[in-house]
Each structure stands twice: as C-alpha cells, then as structure tokens.
C-alpha cells in the first residue's frame, strides 16, 4: 500500500469501523452555512437537520458501511496509522552523529492544537442522503476537508460509527473575522450553521459571502473520572443550538495607553528599564503577532502621566499664572494629567516601522512634561531666566490616572453608531504599565467606569511589565463611607427587620437615611479588566526549571557581602512540642487541610483560641487594631494639622491621650503599657508586609534602640508568664502562635513607668518619620520628612516601605526574628539614620493585626499628599477588608469595654457580591460559646475589634446583587479562596463567561485578547431570582400586535406571509442583540437539564404560559414557535413571549433601580494631539449611561410592525457621504458621451450625479402590490450655493414639489397622431406634472423653461403609448427635431438630464408670450455688460465664473429694514414672483442681518428627501436589509452633494457593497464618493479630548476692501457676499477644496433651513470644506485665525489595496503645503491681489438698458416660425 504499511488490526475488532478509499472533489458552491443558497426565501430558522435528508458534504454509498445506517447517523473519518519502515539512512546517521534534534513533524492544520489522545482528531459528520451511484469502496469529501486533516487522495481512511452523538457536538466555537460584523449577524451566522459540521480552519459565510469568518478552535467539555468537566480541543464538531460562538475581530479600533510614571524610567531586577521593555520587548512582539494573524487594526497609541506638585511648587505655578489645569485628587495632592498622542487612528501593514518614532517620543516625554511645557508658558509671559525651574514629580504607577485614560477612550465610543466605519468591529483598550496591576482610584470614577464598561459590553487589558505580585490582581482600592451600625430593612409587611450591608461602591452617604457613618478602605477586583504580566527578560530566555523569587527582603538583599556577619547568625532549635507527630502518613488532602487551617488562623477575624472555660484573659474581646494608617484614608479624615509631639512622652500623657484615639487603638496602647511595653506612635511610613516584603531604602537603627533589642527575650518571657494558656506549646509559625496576634490582651493595672519597661520589638527598629498627634477626634495628621527623590526598587507599582519597625516579642511571631536582626546589629547601629521613603505596595489584613505595631506597610505619600480634605461623612472610619490599607484613627470612646465572644457559623457563598471579608474560619476552629450573628459578621463592633464578615448570606439578597454580579466585587487580595475567585469570575464576568472556555493563567500574557479582541458573547446564564428582581428592578409589560402596516419595512413580505408572529419575534430579538443584549440560557454546567430553572415569579401573568429558560436559547424557542426568550443588557432584562391564544407578542421588561448618584465627572488636563506642537488645555465630561430612557424599546417594537416609522427616539447607526468633484479627468468608456453631443467637464459632473441617483433609485424598497410606491429620488439643479438658492422663489417652489410630491398625468391620451399645437397646449396646462418656470443658470435667467428629465418623465406619465425611458427619449427627440422645443442656448439636442433646460419654440409658446415680453426670454442676472449675458463678463476668469463655491456673507447694515421673502406659491402667474436683475443681491443684503418680522416666524425650508432603500434586492440575506436614505434635493455640481444613511442592525457588508458600487460609478464621471463625519470638525474635542482640529493661522490678514460687494456684483459673483471672500478663495482656487457645508449664519435670518439628517438646533459655526481627494476637512474661521484642519479619519484609516501609509503621508503633505502658504506673508499678499475683482467701470450701461438691448438683438436672431398643424 502506498505511503507505508497498512495496519488493519484495529479495523477487524468490531463492525463499528471500516476502511474506505478517500477521494476528494471541489464543491461548486460552499455548502457551509447560509452561503449554500444565495437566495433566502424566508428569514425563519431552519431545523438543525432534517431526519430524512440532513445536509452533508460527504458522499458515500450506504452499501459501503457494514452496519445498518440511516440519514442523520454520526460518523467520523480518521487517518489510519501507518508504520513507516525503520531503515537507517545516511542522512539520519549523520544527523545522529552531529547531535541535531530531528525536525518536528508538522501536523495537519486542523490538528495543530489538538492534543493526541485528548481530543477528537477525526472529521465528524452527519450522514446525508444515500448515493447509490458512488463506489462502495470509496468515500468522497471536499478537497478543503482533505487538506485540513491531511487526508491524501486515493488512500484508505478509517470510517467509524459514533454511538454517543452528544460527544460529537461542539460546546464552543471561536471565529476570527476582519470586517464590520453586527451582533445580529453573528447570531444569524450561528443559527445558519446549526446541524452542520465545522472543522478548525474552515471559512464560513452568510448572505452570499457578505459575512465571512474563519473557525479558530472547537472545544467540548468532557467530564473526567471525578466528574469535573474539562474543556478539550476538537478538530471538528457538529454545531447545535447549545453551541456557544465566540467572535474575535482582527479589524478593531485599538487604543494602546502607555503609562509614564516613576517606575517607567527605572530598572527591573534583570537590569532592563521598563521603558525599554515597552519599545524593545512588548510592542515588537505584539506587532509581530498582529502581522502573523493578518490583522488590520486601526491603532491609537497614547502616553499618559500624572505629575504631582508640592505646595511650594503650587505656589510657584500660581505666581506665574500656570494653575489652569491644576487639580486635587481625593487625598488632597495637587496634580496635572498629561496625555500625548503618538499614533492616531492609523492602519499600517508593517507596524515595526513605527517603533523608532515611538521610541523617540518616549525619550523626549520626560523633558516635555517636566520642563518644556512650563518653559514655553514662562517664555510667553517674559519670565526671567533665573525664575525658570523644573517643577513636578512623576507619580508612582499605583497613583496613575488609569481610569481617566479609559474614560477618555470611552467618550468617542459612546456614539460608536455615529460615523460608523464599515470596515472594523470592536474597541480594544490596552494599558501598559510598569506597575503590578493595583491602582488607588476615586470611588465615584471607579463606579462610573464600571457602569460604562458594562453598558458597552467591553473589557480592558492591563499589561504589567513586572512579575505577578502575591496578591490578587487587577486591584482597585478606594475610600468609601459606610454605616457604622446595621441598616435595617423590612423584608415584608410585618416581617422582622434584617440588617443590610450596602455595596460600598454604590453607597452614597448623602443619599442614604443612615446618619451614623464612617470612612473605610475597600478593595475591588473588577471583572471588566484582564491582567497580563509581560515579565520577559530578553537576555535571559525563559526556562521552566528556573526558580523565580516571589518575595524578597529588600533591606537584607541590599546589604553588602561584608555586611553579612554570617558567623553571628544562630538559628534557635526547634521545640520538640512544636514538631507534629502524625500517626499515619499525611495524604495530599491532609496537607492541604493543614495549610488551609494555618491560613485560616492567620486571616480569620476572630481568634480561634478563645475556648469555653478559659481565663478572663483568654475570653477577653479581641482588641484588633489596624495594621497601619492609610495615607488615603488619613487624607479623607484629616480636619486640621497640629504641631508635632515628641515621640517619647511621660506615661501619663499616653494614658491621657488614649481617649483621643479610637477605642481599638486606645485599647491596644493600654494593653502594651500594662504588659510593660513602651507605646510608640506608629510611623506613617508604610512597612513591608509579612506576606510580601518589598524593597525599601536602607535605614539604620539608633544605638539606643539597638541596645534595647536584647530585651526582646525578656518581653517574650513576660508574655509567657502573663498568658500561659495562650503561649503554651506554641511553636514558631504555628497556628496557635499566629492566632495569638489576633487575640490581644485586655488592659491590666499599670505596674511600671514607661521609661522602666523593657522595650518591645516596636522599638527595635528606627522610626523614619515623625508623627504628629492631632487632638482632633476624627484623625491624626501625619507628616513625613521625605527626600526630594525617593528611590524605588524594581517591579514596584507603589512606593517602597521602610523595614518593619516592630517585631513580635517572641522571635517566632515576627516576620524577622531577633536572631536575624542581631546578626546585622553592628552594621545597623553604625549607619546613619535615613529618612522615610515611599513604601512599595504591600498586601496585608487590618482585621488580623496584632495589638502592637508589627504591621504590614502601605504606600506613604509625599508631604503634600497627606493634607486631605476634612471628612464630611462623620467620625472616623474603620478599615474593611483592607489589605494594604492603614486603619483610620477611631473616634473618642472608652478604651475598653468587655463584650461577649460569639461564634460564627460557617457561611455559604452566593452569587451576590458584597464587600468581601477576609475568609471566615472553619466552624471547628471558632469559639463555641455562642453563635455570631449577622451583625457581628458584617461589622466590627465599636471598640471590640471583632472581625465582621461582609459575606453574610442573609444580607446578600438585600445588597445590590445584580449591580455587583455584573460590575463590582470586593475581595481580600491577600488570601482569596478558590470559591471566591470563582465567584468573582462568575459575578462580574457573567456577561463574558462564554468567551473563555478555559481558565486563563494570569502570569502569562493573554495574547488572544491582545491580538484579536473578543466581541461580547451572544449568550449569558445570568438571571436574578424573584427576590432580587422585586428589590432591584422596576417592571412593566406591553404587547405588540402581529399585523403589519403599509409603511413597515423591517419584515420581509414572504416571511410575513409564512409566519408573521415568528418573523416579528426573530426581528425583535435581532434588534435587541444589535443593541448589546444577550440571550439568557440555562447554565452551561446544569446537571439536570430537564429541571426548569426558577424564574422571577412576578413576571408570570398566566399559569399556562411557559417562561422557563432553555439551553438552546432563542434559536430553540424560534424553532418551536412557542415559549419565551429572555434577554439581558446591563440594566435591562426583557422577556419576549408568544401569546398562546392571541396573535401578539408580550414583552415584559425589567429595569434596574438606580439608587446612587449619577452626576457626571468633569475632567481637565493637558493633551498633545497628533499634529500639534505642544500640550494644550483640554476638558471632558464622563457621564453615566442613561438607564431610564436610553433606548425606547416600545417604540422599536412598534417600528417593526409599521405602527411607527421614526428613528429619532432610537439609537440607530448612521454615516454621511458626500459626492464631490475629484479633480480627475472622467474615465473614458463606451456610452459616456451621447452621439453628436459635446459635453464639457461641468456637464459630466452633473451627469455623474444623475447616474448616482439613478443607481439609488434602483435600490428603493418595493412595497407590496396595491400599496403606494416611493417616489424616485431627484435633484433640483442650481448654480447657487445653499445660502443663496433659498432666495430663488421659483427654485424653492420646485423644491417643495419634489419633496411633497407633484401631480402626474392621467395617462389616457395617445401621443401618436397628436399635433404639435395640441402637445404644446398640454404642456402648458397647470398641474400636469411638467414644471415650466423661470430658472437661474450660470448668471442668467431662463423664463418658461423646463429640463429634459422632467419632459421625458412627463411623456411617460401622460401618454399611454409612451412606455419606458427609451421610448420617451425617442419621442422627445422627435419633438425637438420637428421644432416644438429647443435648448435654451441651442447648444444641445434633447438629453434627459436634470441640468439641461429647454423651452417651447415660437409660436408654440404663445401661452407664455406675455410673460416673455414682461420678463424677457433670457435675462442677465445683473446685466453688467451691454452685450447681454450669454457669456460671463470678460473680467471674470473661467475659474471665477465656474466657482460658485467662492462666496461670502454680505456686509449689511443691521439697522437696514428687513425685507421678507415673497412666499407666493405656484399656481399663480409666473410674473407674480418676478425678480428684477439684482433682486437676489438686494434681498440678501436686506434680510441677512435683519430680524424676522415682529410676530412672524422664520420660514422653514426642507432641503432633503427621505427614502427607504432595500440593500438586498437579490435576496442574498435571510432578513429584510433596509436603510433610510436622506439626500439633498438642491445641488450645485461644484459643491458637495450630501447623503446620510440610517439603519437598524443590517448586514453592514451589504452597505459596503452599495458604497463601493456608488464610488466606482462616481469615478467614471470625475466625481468622488467620500465618507465624512456627521458633525463639524470644530466639535471633535467635545467627543474626544485628545483629538482636535489643527489651527492654521494666516501670516497676513486679508485686506479690507470697502467696495468688495460692488465689485463682486459687477463680476456676477453670486449675491455679492464679501465676508471671508479671500479665505474661501485660498481653499477653492489655490488648494482644490470643495464647499461641504455652509456656516449657519450665512443664511438669511428670516429663513430656517431644515435637513432631516441633522438634529434640531445643530449649527455649523464655520463653513466647512472637503479636499477633492477626500483626505482632509477644513473649516474657515476667517481673519488671521485662518482655518481649522482635520484629516478625514474615515478615509485615511480605511483599508485600501495599496495600503494606508500613502494616505497618511498624502494628508500630511497637503497640510504642510497649506501651512507653508499661510505662513508666507509675501505669497498671501500676492494672492490677495490676484483674486481681488477689479472695480466696476464707469461706462457701463444701466441694467435696464443692457437688458433691452439684449432682448432686441435676440428677437432679431429668432424670427417666429409660422404655426403649422404638424402631426406626430
């Protein structure tokens, strides 16, 4: 057999497999997904597979299988293992001699990530119809399948029968895509694949290829022997309704935020600076992975930093007036935020080329922020050189403005549906930080960010350049108020009140009825943040066997080798009693139990040593003090600063001052005194944690204190004597010893003076900062003497701490035993004292701290950071779940009050989330005297130090369960239990649960998320229970009738005829998915699928209505045609229900109650936008999502059935396009020029616009027969600009007729045989559909004229024998040839164009003869030349004559009387609206600056037409693909013609297909179809603070010409507007810009123009122009201010065949050219002279004379022909 020896041993064991020859074939059509059938007659989901004829790509004869088969059976094709003959060759011998490793055999593409023996490696499929003609020894598969699995043609494969069909079903399938893909499209794609087989690497499509994706992996959860489901990768699988689809975008908008802070410029442990890790490590690897995956992201890279300023520096800034952007944080520190955009919205093929520029900008950033910014301001103010100095200091990583950066990126995404880019999907935010993933943040900003992230369905990636810390990450710490006592809540009428623990993140003291509140430190583990650790050292490749230290002692590590007097180090012997003597070998479970027991003894809030019958000392309440003072908490509580007090005070002073301390603190100090300890105020400088001691600066001990170190053992002995029951049989590190630290000793009568007492370990280390005791009952004011520049160790995200300044009296109880310190005593006692330095972030518990000062450390802010705002929330705070937070000082209270020790029951974990406690101890280790109640577990009793768990199950239901389960989770980051971690993942991450089938490891980089961000999953399993829904939600119900109005357009007619209710339900689900809803399904791991999940009962109106969830989600319900579909999104839950008896759909909605403040956060800072030359001021508003009325779903549902047709109340997608001249020559092609016609460039521009409109007319939605059809899109041609054309009454009447419709003929006549006179008579009848009016064109006025398009349309609508456009054109040409009509200038034959005007020839125009005598047949607009107006005046160049873009507002006297426009309508004699030769200019001057007539209203003029487009006329999609088109009506071909498309959840690829078609057609005629922003570029900073238009100033202001208006009128320049004439000329005549939108104030003041695609009240501050390439937009500010420039990001960042680099460079070159010209005063002066019109000549004839002369000459040339009865 070819390819090796065939091993058929496996094939003979049973009859469930067979060997067949495999043949490949190439399918004619891709059967995968919906693309198998290009036309979808129905939008209803098909069954997974018909039992009779399931779809299959495998062709096989049933006779080839040795068992009975039927359609739908599951089979698998596998390769047969072939053993290759082991014949040694010369090459293998040489290879073995050289010691080279054999090359790894490359596996087939579908099997690359499938572990051999641990996943399915074959191709599974469902058996289709029998193929009796196929060979019984063959099986045929598509060639793509054979390539993916390595099947070779004409080789045997093994075909297996699969008995367990469930084992072939895929649980998860991940797709990659590179286009804009809506969530509804994802859902439809998944449903279209149900019942089909997919394999890894397969490409699937929907809607005829409009939606395309590729399978990345297939996973199925398989249960192991212990019953735990473990995900395993499959090479293929069958899609079912239960399959969860994961979509990752390779074309997203990516934001890379790189944090600049103190650590950025420092070295890590491996000798590499963190800034180098970014530019030489992380970014190159990221870009390489992007290239490998073929991504096409649009990338923005931003550097962000926060600079702190001391008080003296603030005074310096105030002195020089530089405090504009100065702010204060919650701790009272002064700071400024800096953001610099390094790369802005760029798409590149090779991102490696950007690294040098990024590196240069990073290297310059330190000087730019700390010096250059203020230096530029000082130089501008003329400051002396000696006054210039560097001010500010980098913040540490944990103090960074990371939330501000995230919110700034979210601001433009708030309206992601506006200016929709049709080539990308999703937003990825990545923050690269040298920290460890912990950030100290403001509570309100954290809450706001959480709400916004959940609302958008997004996540953020933190990439930390350090090694993973020993605490949980990501971690946000904040300060919050909390109630001191339990909050009572009535569970029902007459029910017993229960205590409630509020979620502190959502607790606002000023909105609560609770008055007795305090401050507390909280730690939150955000579910919307994913953390990766890029701790790669490039000169030390990663090795699995390399030991990596996780915890280092900085002070000892930094001691030199000579300092280590190792000979004096003596390790005490172990006590025999301390050695455990197990009676049997310990199992793994035993060891784990011992470790957990040990950890519980450390982290439990109550001592486990208090037993029944113990001594009063044993049973005394645990007086637990906080581990140290939190700098942030102190800042919140500090009310005043007082003078410092001496560290050594008389004992009486200590006792006297104990009343000013909190009860716990006072008790602790009293305990220390009574035990003979010297009570020393704790240093505010943080200390290393016993769990994670970080590096600190070297400090020395004073000789006095070092001599006291010897007393440690004496203190230990005394403690042993005082508390024998506690310390008996204790051993170093044992649970008993550790638990002793949480069972403090009650106060005893004082027996010695302070000075005589032996020193406790608290005195054995120096105090590196002085502490000032404040008499304030609420706080102490702490001041540290700090160096100007703190030194930091590697890997620090927070400041480093001093060494532990307190040790346990017994060596085994301290982190550093006395024998270690004694060994360093010579060194420490001789070194100089050092100052306090900021401590690195440590994680420790406050509620397990001992009574002395052996406590973990916390970040210690600088001097300026410790001045905080006075506490407004009441007395002093108590710490809560506070790793690495200091305990606030307590309010005045007696130092000790006995209390009863109560026992805590084992608690149960729940899905609700409260501020997490430290893990409660097991029941067996808790006191047995009594049961600890909920209050005791939730709050620490004042003065008693009892640990209070915030996980009480009876309180969880009262907490805002949904709020936390979808947003917020507090946690003890030092010791989170496995169950807690699961709760965190399941709570806030429930919306993202089905994105990660496998649990990821945080110590690795999450490359899949960084390469291709995942979209929000389509399904979730979160649903609140009845109690939660009653307490947390408001509910309501409405119904949607299942019938369709005539105006509906969201349901296809064929689907409505098949099953209207089903079609409406599917569309309602589809629209909600597009708005970020998720379908709620049964939990994936539900062990009893047949058991219904409890639903919120209050929604059940009828007992016989099924409301249970289904595992298959919406697809399963739609197939059944009955039941309910549950959906959720952020704050909303909807249930859509088929009514069992009525033709209607019942919608139950639930909206979360908002009980917290929702005020917006105002931010200000300094930004350096791309293209600018320095930092500039910026501000932004961070707003909460609007929960109550963000989307009107009632309106949306009734829009589906046609009861409503307005999009306004909804969140709909929109994008704007403009049609502009491209400046290129038209593409020559057959049919471009009509025969015997010579069209100029302007004529081709008009023709191109007409062709575009005709194409759009073919996309108009065809309504069902018997209903009115939509009118065709038309253009009313003009050569005026928008602000001028509104003064042309005839034009405005034509506009109104087009918008509101016009009458058409009755089509009862026949044209054949009719005389010319009869045709002329019909043409002149009023209201017959043919508009004959006076028209302005190119400075001339044509009376009694009509255009060719209107005549052709009139012939079609009037005569029954004129059918079709071609027939009408033939008849119109015949009328022209027979002398009935002619072109107004006799330069063209008949062409049905909108811009070519015709008139009746004499004598057929007798009905208008009186008008011709009165108005004149052809009038010059201003008749400035005696030769008439057949051509422009000689003084007007061709460019000037053709450029009506160059106009300006008239300079009118405000006091001039206002002239109202003539509002007469059609139907009157045309002479009634006659205007004299200069009427437009005169009217404009009168009304432009005037006010509307008193008592009157502005005249509203609608300028747009609205139509419904069918984007899928060929029915490729399975649903109605419609969009609303808004288009201009009046158009000047030299200006931009505007389109705006609005839609609700359509397949974007069909929109892109239409755009490409219109773009290609436009280019043929010298036009360009360009996508542009909806709003003006001047408003860009309102949405995005770090983007702004670039100002381009004029070096020379335009000259002031008093008679400029007269000169412009003399050259027939519009209405003679003179304002900004020179600026407009620069743009249009010099640099090829085209007028896009005119400024609002250029329109007459008594006219209000209305555009249906603009919001009411939206005004354009300045006129906006677009470059003919579409790459740039410019607004004209005027004067020396010049212009505002902005690249058109929608064009610059769009994908192109040639790449995007050339577009970016081209846009920059255009801007550079304009900047250079505007900065050259000499060139400007010369240009002003060139474009200035000459003054009018004195010998000109008057307008009347000129017109009479012209008319006489024209009459001589045109003699009326005798009227004849010519028949047609």
Swiss-Prot record:
Domain of life: Eukaryota
SMART domains reported for this sequence: DEP
This protein's UniProt keywords: Membrane, Vacuole
Species: Cryptococcus neoformans var. neoformans serotype D (strain B-3501A) (Filobasidiella neoformans)
Stored PANTHER family: DEP DOMAIN CONTAINING PROTEIN 5, GATOR COMPLEX PROTEIN DEPDC5
Polar residues composition-biased segments: 655-670, 704-732, 902-914
Protein name in the entry: Vacuolar membrane-associated protein IML1
SUPFAM superfamilies: Winged helix' DNA-binding domain
Domain DEP span(s) in chain numbering: 1326-1402
GO CC annotations, alphabetized: GATOR1 complex; vacuolar membrane
Biased composition (Low complexity): 688-703, 756-779, 879-894
Pfam families per UniProt: DEP, IML1
Subcellular location: Vacuole membrane
């Amino acid at each position: 057999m070819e390819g090796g020896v065939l091993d058929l041993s496996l094939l003979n064991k049973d009859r469930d497999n067979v060997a067949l020859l495999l043949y490949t074939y190439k399918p004619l059509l891709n059967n995968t997904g919906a693309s198998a059938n290009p036309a979808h007659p129905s939008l209803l989901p098909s069954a997974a597979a018909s039992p009779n004829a399931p779809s299959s790509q495998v062709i096989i004869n049933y006779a080839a299988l040795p068992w009975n088969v039927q359609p739908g059976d599951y089979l698998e094709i596998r390769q047969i293992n072939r053993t290759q003959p082991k014949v040694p060759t010369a090459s293998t011998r040489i290879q073995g001699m050289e010691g080279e490793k054999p090359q790894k055999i490359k596996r087939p593409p579908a099997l690359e990530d499938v572990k051999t023996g641990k996943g399915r490696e074959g191709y599974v499929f469902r058996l289709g119809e029998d193929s009796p003609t196929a060979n019984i020894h063959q099986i045929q598969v598509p060639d793509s399948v054979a390539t993916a699995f390595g099947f070779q043609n004409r080789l045997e494969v093994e075909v297996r029968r699969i008995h367990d069909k469930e084992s072939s079903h895929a649980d998860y399938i991940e797709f990659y895509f590179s286009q804009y893909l809506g969530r509804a499209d994802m859902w439809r794609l998944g449903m279209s694949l149900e019942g089909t087989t997919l394999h890894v690497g397969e490409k699937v499509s929907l809607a005829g290829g409009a939606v395309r994706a590729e399978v990345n992996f297939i996973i199925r959860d398989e249960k192991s022997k212990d019953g735990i489901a473990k995900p395993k990768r499959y090479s293929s699988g069958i899609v079912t309704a239960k399959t969860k689809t994961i979509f990752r975008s390779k074309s997203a908008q990516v934001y890379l935020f790189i944090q600049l802070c103190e650590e950025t410029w420092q070295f890590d442990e491996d000798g590499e600076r963190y800034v180098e890790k970014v530019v030489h490590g992380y970014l190159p690897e990221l870009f390489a992975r992007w290239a490998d995956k073929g991504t096409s992201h649009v990338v923005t890279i931003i550097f962000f930093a926060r600079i702190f300023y001391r008080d003296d520096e603030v005074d310096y800034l105030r002195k020089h007036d530089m405090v504009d952007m100065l702010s204060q944080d919650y701790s009272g520190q002064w700071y400024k935020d800096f953001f610099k955009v390094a790369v802005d919205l760029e798409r590149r093929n090779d991102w490696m080329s950007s690294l040098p520029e990024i590196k240069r900008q990073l290297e310059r950033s330190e000087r730019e922020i700390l010096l250059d910014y203020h230096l530029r301001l000082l130089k501008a103010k003329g400051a002396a050189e000696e006054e210039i100095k560097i001010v500010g200091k980098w913040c540490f990583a944990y103090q960074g403005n990371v939330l501000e950066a995230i919110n700034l990126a979210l601001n433009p995404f708030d309206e992601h549906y506006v200016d929709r880019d049709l080539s990308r999907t999703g937003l990825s935010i990545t923050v690269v930080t040298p920290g460890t993933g912990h950030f100290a943040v403001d509570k309100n900003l954290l809450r706001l960010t959480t709400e916004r992230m959940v609302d958008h369905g997004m996540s953020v990636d933190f990439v930390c350049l350090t090694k993973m810390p020993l605490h949980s990450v990501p971690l946000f710490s904040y300060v919050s108020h909390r109630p001191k006592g339990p909050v009572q809540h009535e569970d029902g009428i007459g029910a017993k009140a229960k205590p409630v623990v509020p979620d502190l993140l959502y607790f606002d003291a000023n909105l609560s009825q609770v008055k007795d509140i305090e401050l507390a430190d909280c730690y939150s583990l955000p579910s919307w943040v994913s953390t990766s650790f890029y701790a790669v050292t490039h000169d030390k490749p990663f090795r699995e066997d390399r030991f990596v230290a996780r915890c280092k002692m900085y002070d000892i590590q930094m001691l030199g080798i000579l300092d280590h007097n190792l000979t004096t180090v003596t390790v005490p012997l172990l006590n025999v009693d301390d050695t455990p003597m197990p009676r049997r070998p310990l199992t793994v479970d035993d060891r784990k139990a011992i470790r957990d027991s040990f950890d519980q003894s450390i982290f439990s809030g109550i001592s486990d040593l208090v037993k029944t019958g113990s001594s009063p000392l044993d049973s005394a309440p645990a007086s637990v003090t906080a581990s140290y003072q939190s700098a942030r908490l102190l800042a919140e509580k500090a009310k005043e600063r007082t003078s410092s007090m001496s560290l050594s005070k008389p004992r009486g002073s200590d006792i006297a001052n104990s009343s000013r301390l909190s009860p716990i603190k006072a008790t602790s100090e009293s305990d220390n005194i009574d035990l003979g300890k010297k009570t020393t105020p704790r240093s505010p400088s943080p200390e290393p944690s016993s769990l994670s001691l970080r590096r600190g600066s070297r400090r020395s001990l004073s000789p006095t204190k070092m001599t006291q170190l010897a007393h440690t053992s004496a203190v230990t002995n005394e403690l042993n004597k005082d508390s024998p029951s506690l310390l008996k049989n204790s051993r170093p590190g044992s649970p008993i010893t550790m638990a002793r630290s949480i069972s403090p000793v009650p106060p005893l009568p004082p027996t010695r003076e302070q000075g005589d007492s032996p020193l406790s370990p608290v005195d054995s280390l120096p105090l590196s900062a002085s502490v000032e005791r404040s008499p304030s009952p609420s706080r102490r004011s702490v001041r540290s003497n700090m160096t100007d520049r703190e030194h930091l160790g590697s890997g620090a995200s927070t400041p480093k701490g001093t060494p532990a300044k307190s040790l346990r009296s017994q060596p085994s109880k301290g982190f550093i035993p006395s024998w270690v310190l004694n060994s360093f005593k010579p060194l420490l006692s001789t070194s100089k004292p050092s100052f306090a330095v900021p401590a690195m972030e440590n994680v420790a518990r406050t509620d397990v701290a001992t009574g002395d000062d052996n406590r973990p450390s916390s970040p210690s802010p600088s001097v300026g950071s410790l001045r905080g705002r006075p506490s407004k929330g009441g007395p002093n705070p108590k710490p809560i779940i506070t790793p690495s937070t200091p305990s606030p000082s307590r309010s005045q209270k007696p130092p000790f009050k006995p209390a009863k020790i109560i026992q805590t029951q084992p608690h149960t974990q729940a899905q609700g989330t409260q501020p997490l406690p430290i893990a409660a101890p097991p029941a067996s280790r808790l006191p047995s005297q009594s049961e600890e109640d909920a209050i005791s577990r939730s709050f620490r009793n004042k003065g008693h130090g009892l640990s209070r768990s915030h996980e009480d199950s009876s309180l969880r239901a009262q907490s805002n369960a949904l709020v936390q389960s979808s947003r917020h989770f507090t946690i003890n980051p030092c010791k989170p239990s496995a169950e807690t971690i699961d709760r965190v993942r399941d709570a806030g991450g429930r919306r993202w649960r089905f994105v990660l089938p496998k649990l990821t490891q945080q110590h690795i980089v999450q490359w899949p998320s960084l390469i291709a961000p995942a979209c929000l999953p389509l399904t979730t399993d979160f649903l609140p229970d009845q109690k939660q829904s009653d307490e947390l939600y408001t509910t309501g119900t409405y119904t949607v009738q299942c019938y369709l109005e005539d105006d509906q357009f969201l349901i296809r007619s064929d689907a409505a005829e098949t099953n209207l209710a089903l079609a409406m339900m599917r569309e309602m689900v589809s629209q909600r998915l597009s708005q970020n809803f998720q379908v709620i399904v049964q939990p994936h791991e539900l062990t009893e699928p047949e058991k219904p999940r409890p639903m919120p009962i209050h929604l059940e109106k009828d007992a016989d209505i099924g409301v249970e969830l289904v595992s298959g989600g919406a697809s399963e319900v739609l197939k059944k045609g009955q039941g309910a579909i549950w959906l959720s999104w952020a704050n909303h839950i909807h249930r859509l229900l088929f009514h069992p008896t009525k033709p209607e759909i019942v919608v139950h909605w639930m909206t979360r109650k908002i009980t917290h403040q929702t005020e917006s956060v105002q931010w200000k800072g300094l930004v350096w936008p791309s293209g600018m030359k320095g930092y500039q001021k910026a501000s932004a508003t961070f707003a909460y999502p609007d929960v109550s009325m963000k989307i009107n779903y009632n309106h949306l549902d009734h829009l589906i059935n046609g009861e409503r047709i307005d999009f306004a109340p909804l969140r709909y997608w929109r994008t704007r396009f403009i049609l502009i001249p491209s400046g290129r020559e038209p593409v020559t092609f057959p049919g471009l020029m009509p025969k015997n016609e010579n069209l100029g460039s302007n004529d081709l521009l008009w023709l191109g616009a007409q062709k575009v409109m005709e194409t759009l007319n073919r996309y108009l939605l065809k309504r069902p027969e018997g209903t009115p059809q939509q009118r065709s899109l038309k253009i009313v041609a003009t050569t005026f600009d928008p602000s001028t054309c509104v003064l042309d009454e005839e034009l405005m009447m034509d506009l109104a007729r087009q918008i509101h419709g016009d009458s058409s003929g009755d089509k009862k006549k026949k044209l054949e045989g009719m005389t010319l006179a009869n045709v002329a008579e019909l043409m002149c009848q009023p209201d017959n559909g043919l508009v004959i009016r006076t028209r302005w064109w190119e400075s001339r006025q044509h009376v009694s004229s009509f255009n060719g398009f209107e005549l052709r349309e009139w012939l079609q609508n009037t005569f029954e024998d004129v059918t079709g456009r071609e027939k009408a054109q033939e008849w119109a040409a015949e009328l022209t040839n027979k002398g009935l009509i002619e072109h107004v200038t006799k330069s063209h034959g008949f062409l049905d164009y909108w811009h070519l005007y015709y008139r009746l020839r004499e004598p057929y125009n007798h009905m208008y003869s009186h008008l011709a005598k009165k108005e004149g047949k052809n009038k010059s607009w201003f008749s400035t030349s005696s030769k008439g107006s057949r051509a422009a005046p000689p003084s007007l160049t061709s460019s000037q004559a053709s450029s009506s873009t160059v106009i300006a507002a008239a300079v009118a006297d405000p006091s001039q009387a206002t002239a109202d426009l003539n509002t007469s309508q059609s139907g009157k004699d045309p002479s009634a609206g006659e205007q004299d030769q200069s009427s437009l200019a005169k009217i404009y001057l009168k009304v432009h600056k005037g006010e509307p007539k008193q008592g009157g209203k502005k005249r509203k003029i609608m300028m747009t037409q609205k139509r419904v487009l069918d984007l899928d006329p060929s029915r490729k999609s399975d649903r109605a693909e419609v969009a609303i088109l808004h288009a201009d009506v009046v158009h000047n071909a030299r200006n931009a013609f505007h389109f705006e498309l609005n839609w609700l959840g359509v397949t974007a690829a069909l929109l892109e297909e239409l755009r490409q078609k219109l773009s290609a057609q436009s280019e043929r005629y010298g036009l360009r179809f360009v996508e542009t922003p909806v709003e003006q570029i001047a408003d860009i900073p309102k949405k995005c603070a770090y983007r702004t238009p670039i100002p381009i100033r004029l070096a020379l202001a335009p000259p002031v010409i008093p008679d400029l208006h007269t000169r412009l009128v003399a050259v027939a320049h519009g209405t003679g507007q003179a304002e900004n004439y020179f600026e407009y000329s620069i743009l249009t005549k010099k640099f090829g810009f085209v007028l896009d939108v005119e400024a609002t104030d250029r329109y007459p003041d008594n006219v209000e123009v209305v555009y249906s695609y603009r919001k009411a009240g939206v005004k354009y501050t300045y006129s906006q122009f677009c470059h003919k390439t579409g790459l740039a937009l410019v607004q004209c500010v005027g004067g020396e201010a010049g212009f505002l420039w902005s690249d058109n990001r929608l064009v610059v960042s769009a994908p192109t065949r040639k790449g995007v680099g050339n577009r970016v460079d081209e846009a920059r070159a255009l801007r550079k050219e304009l900047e250079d010209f505007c900065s050259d005063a000499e060139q400007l002066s010369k240009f002003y002279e060139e474009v200035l019109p000459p003054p009018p000549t004195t010998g000109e004839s008057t307008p009347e004379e000129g017109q009479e002369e012209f008319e006489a000459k024209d009459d001589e040339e045109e003699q009326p022909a005798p009227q004849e009865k010519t028949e047609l």
